[in-house]
Amino acid sequence: EKVKEHYLSTLQPAKAKTILGCIELLESRYYEVARPPELQKQLDREWIADMKDYPEDLIHQACVNWRNSSQSFAPRSAGVLMESVKPEYVRRKSLYLKAKSVLELI
């Protein structure tokens, strides 16, 4: 059971506040467009919805990877931003599912 909990802990989703904090900090490094408050709220909701399954450490790592890339603009979508950490996320999910299925056999 501890093994399953360990792998599950590596998939613990980030909180909405963490997601927005990371995105706001990353976007602040680039040219920012003034947006009406309602539009900004909708964009924030979309970022949260699109990234709600990702663990906090992978969101931070994706932001670091973006900052250290040759991109001269802020990411426009979660898919583009998270591309660099997607293999690690998939690896973690696979390990969790394997551990879970093995433990169910025991």
What is the predicted role of each segment?
Residues E1-I106:
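Charged interaction scaffolds used for protein-protein
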